[in-house]
A protein has these predicted regions:
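Helix-loop-helix junctions and helix-breaking kinks within/between transmembrane helices
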Residues: 44-53, 98-103, 156-159, 189-228, ...
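Hydrophobic transmembrane alpha-helices of multi-pass, membrane-embedded glycosylation machinery
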Residues: 56-63, 107-111, 209-221, 352, ...
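A membrane-periplasm/extracellular boundary helix in multi-pass inner-membrane enzymes
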Residues: 198, 202, 220-270, 288-292, ...
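Long extracytoplasmic/lumenal interhelical loops at the membrane interface
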Residues: 270-284, 288, 296-339
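Hydrophobic transmembrane alpha-helices and their immediate junctions
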Residues: 120, 338-381, 416
């Protein structure tokens, strides 16, 4: 309670006007367990994964029916998240593979809806804690795959595995740094964090290792520097503007040195080449496919299908078995091929909305949770240029992006009710109610 005015009554007592708050509901442990299982399903492949996912979706739809008065207003506030999935669902009308397109369209539409339902029932602190528990379980599930981790472990490709374990490592590090976390969860995070790093090293993905370094440094700086800086008026804004200025000056210097190939030098230091491990060839094929229907695209599931000769040519070029469902390793190209320039515009709008909310939440509340959400969002954004995970359904990067952008829309928080008079009686040296 915050006392705002004091009304004296006699020498030893007084009336005060106090702010009254309503505490949020306590979230049952069984709900937290279910949501942890949902996140685990997106972290790592499980036995009976598809039936489990459909059962969980039915539970979410049941929650939607029970709490539609809370869910629908948040859906309306988060409308940029739904425009692309809606257009994708409409694209089944011109997709050459309608059956597969209907399934994918439903999953794309359910992905942001489930995120809204989760944020309606849980606060962001509980969500991140459940994601951490899911990450712990994912590490346990991955232990039997230790020898096959260099080729992907439980995943068909190593970079998928490395990126999932990357988020486990960052969630563990965030929990370890967070003084508000339960003591035993911080101890568990201290055990899981190095194990996650070892698993990442077993799957030699240069991208994931770079993201891990950036994320760890970012969380460390927020914890021990940014939160102290935020206590000084306007200092954060000054540092932010100075940082942007330094970045722009550095970019100008690099761009003016045309005789230097910094990208090739950087990739060489990571053991990569300028084709990004063959991705440039796939990007060229994707650009050709996008030109077939530049405005509305091929429709969902219109390219990566065993019956599509162009897709199988890419498999052959990439030394993959016939029928392998690859990606273009670029989320924007993926959207452009399947949904054209209209879909690409809606995708960029979604990113603009998510980025704006993540930044505004961070500047208004520089807590470790909000800072971690900004770091996660930045990692997912950068990954869109070399991976297609941010153009998919029900995966960890999208969960972190959507839930991070929706964090402050959660109704599960302490709410201001009003003011009430409170009578206080005091003894010499102290006051008591």
């Amino acid at each position: 309670m915050n006392i705002v005015s004091r009304i004296p009554t006699d020498r030893d007592s007084s009336l005060v006007m106090a702010k009254v708050y309503e505490e949020p509901r306590k979230i049952p442990y069984w709900e937290q367990a279910l949501i942890s299982v949902w996140f685990l399903n997106s972290f790592v492949p499980l036995p009976l994964e598809t039936p489990l996912r459909y059962l969980m979706v039915l539970w979410f739809l049941w929650l939607l029916a029970l709490h539609k008065e809370q869910v629908i207003p948040i859906v309306l506030k988060a409308w940029p998240l739904f425009l692309l999935p809606i257009f994708g669902f409409i694209s089944i009308l011109w997709s050459p593979y309608m059956g597969a397109a209907i399934r994918s369209g439903a999953l794309y539409l359910l992905t942001p809806l489930v995120a809204v339902i989760i944020i309606t029932r849980f606060d962001i602190t509980t969500i991140l804690r459940c994601m951490f528990f899911a990450g712990v379980m994912a590490i346990i599930v991955c232990i039997p795959f230790y020898d096959s981790m260099p080729s992907g472990g439980p995943y068909p490709q190593k970079h998928y595995f490395a990126q999932q374990i990357l988020f486990v490592a960052l969630l563990s590090f965030m929990t370890l740094l967070n003084e508000k976390s339960w003591p035993w969860t911080r101890l568990l995070a201290a055990l899981i964090f190095p194990v996650a790093l070892i698993f990442m090293l077993r799957a030699p993905s240069a991208t994931a290792l770079v993201f891990a370094g950036v994320g760890i440094i970012g969380l460390f700086l927020v914890k021990f520097a940014w939160q102290s800086i935020s206590k000084v008026r306007h200092l954060r804004s000054i540092i932010f503007i100075a940082g942007v200025s330094v970045f722009l000056i550095g970019a100008m210097i690099v761009l003016n040195q045309t005789h230097q190939d910094y990208v090739a030098d950087f990739l060489g230091a990571l053991g990569k080449d300028t084709t990004f491990t063959g991705r440039t060839h796939i990007w060229s094929a994707g650009r050709l496919a996008a030109e077939e229907h530049p405005i509305i695209g091929l429709g969902l599931e219109g390219f990566w299908n065993p019956s599509n000769g162009a897709a199988q040519s890419i498999n052959e070029m990439d030394f993959k078995p016939y029928g392998t469902k690859l990606t273009f390793h670029n989320a924007y190209l993926e959207v452009r091929v399947h949904l054209g320039y209209i879909g690409l515009g809606l995708y960029l709008l979604m990113w603009a909305w998510c980025g704006y909310r993540l930044l505004m939440q961070f500047f208004r509340d520089s807590s470790l949770e909000m800072s971690a959400l900004l770091v996660f969002g930045a990692i997912v954004f950068i990954s869109t240029f070399t991976e297609s995970l941010a153009w998919a359904s029900f995966n960890t990067p999208l969960n972190l992006l959507y839930l991070g952008a929706l964090a402050t829309l959660s109704p599960v928080r302490r709410t201001y009710v009003g003011k009430a008079p409170v009578y206080l009686s005091s003894s010499p040296g102290y006051a008591k109610a």
